Amino acid sequence: MSLNFLDFEQPIAELEAKIDSLTAVSRQDEKLDINIDEEVHRLREKSVELTRKIFADLGAWQIAQLARHPQRPYTLDYVRLAFDEFDELAGDRAYADDKAIVGGIARLDGRPVMIIGHQKGRETKEKIRRNFGMPAPEGYRKALRLMQMAERFKMPIITFIDTPGAYPGVGAEERGQSEAIARNLREMSRLGVPVVCTVIGEGGSGGALAIGVGDKVNMLQYSTYSVISPEGCASILWKSADKAPLAAEAMGIIAPRLKELKLIDSIIPEPLGGAHRNPEAMAASLKAQLLADLADLDVLSTEDLKNRRYQRLMSYGYA
């Protein structure tokens, strides 16, 4: 797969282009008198060192760009890589099946679990079908239906958060967008089974929170979680979306800051260069964290789960 490089990765992109050129020449003419392999190896090492240097000092705005990377793994990618026997369940049994939310039963290391997550698209047609990962009310009602099903069958719930926000269209508002989000917040706080939530990309406002109330909340290293996008915040405070980098820093949208504020529990490290560089390794790390979280929660009674979740929610907003 050919990688898409972000603006701040251009020095890496230039090195990788040189490597690709030399590799192509080597393949075309194996009778060359010069040894290209040594030069390719040297450039690869230099690329790794440069990547490590750049990624050691990323700002909030650069991390926000990584969270939106078009090649970043989505919910269904992690389902394929970390789970077995996934059976997707569709529809809210009231209006429609919202493709921006996917969910179903799967096995995690042999254990039945309910998976629910936002799903963006990659190609244009899929992006439109998935509404760019922005759920309508029927998506959140589908999610709630699956959560209640999981509770009936005593299955842990695992959610993956990756949305710019809930869909703000007129139709969504007419069908009760705010009510659907609010109901999910309330009902998730009452669930009698373990709930583990992980932000895998963008965690945008109420659209993220509607499947984000859990006993454990994790973030991938280069994901974001915020009440509004940096561009939206900049447009309100500075009357210009160009101030988005400044807004990103001020808002505290990245995982280390949110862990410092005790809004999340764990930060899951990503492969060098981001999750899209090695989805298999990222899925393995994610799976290990999910198994560890469920092991911690399995020893708790239903009442303990509910009480801990309540205390967690009530602690928000206090330093």
Curated annotation (Swiss-Prot):
As its record notes, the protein acts as a catalyst of: N(6)-carboxybiotinyl-L-lysyl-[protein] + acetyl-CoA = N(6)-biotinyl-L-lysyl-[protein] + malonyl-CoA
KW Protein transport (keyword) present: no
Q: List, for all copies, the residue spans of the domain called CoA carboxyltransferase C-terminal.
A: 35-296
Q: Where in the cell is it found?
A: Cytoplasm
- The protein's predominant localisation is cytoplasm
Instruction: Spell out where the chain crosses the membrane.
Output: none
Q: What is stated about the way this protein's activity is regulated?
A: Competitively inhibited by pyrrolidine dione antibiotic moiramide B (CPD1).
Q: Which GO terms describe its biological process?
A: fatty acid biosynthetic process; long-chain fatty acid biosynthetic process; malonyl-CoA biosynthetic process
Keyword terms of this UniProt record: ATP-binding, Cytoplasm, Fatty acid biosynthesis, Fatty acid metabolism, Lipid biosynthesis, Lipid metabolism, Nucleotide-binding, Transferase
Q: Name one GO molecular function term.
A: ATP binding
Query: Which pathway does the protein contribute to?
Result: Lipid metabolism; malonyl-CoA biosynthesis; malonyl-CoA from acetyl-CoA: step 1/1
Q: What is its EC number?
A: 2.1.3.15
Q: Name one GO cellular component term.
A: acetate CoA-transferase complex
Q: Please explain the role this protein plays, according to its UniProt record.
A: Component of the acetyl coenzyme A carboxylase (ACC) complex. First, biotin carboxylase catalyzes the carboxylation of biotin on its carrier protein (BCCP) and then the CO(2) group is transferred by the carboxyltransferase to acetyl-CoA to form malonyl-CoA.
Q: How does it assemble?
A: Acetyl-CoA carboxylase is a heterohexamer composed of biotin carboxyl carrier protein (AccB), biotin carboxylase (AccC) and two subunits each of ACCase subunit alpha (AccA) and ACCase subunit beta (AccD).
Classification via PANTHER family: ACETYL-COENZYME A CARBOXYLASE CARBOXYL TRANSFERASE SUBUNIT ALPHA, ACETYL-COENZYME A CARBOXYLASE CARBOXYL TRANSFERASE SUBUNIT ALPHA, CHLOROPLASTIC
Family listed: Belongs to the AccA family.
Tell me the protein's name: Acetyl-coenzyme A carboxylase carboxyl transferase subunit alpha
Species: Escherichia coli (strain K12)
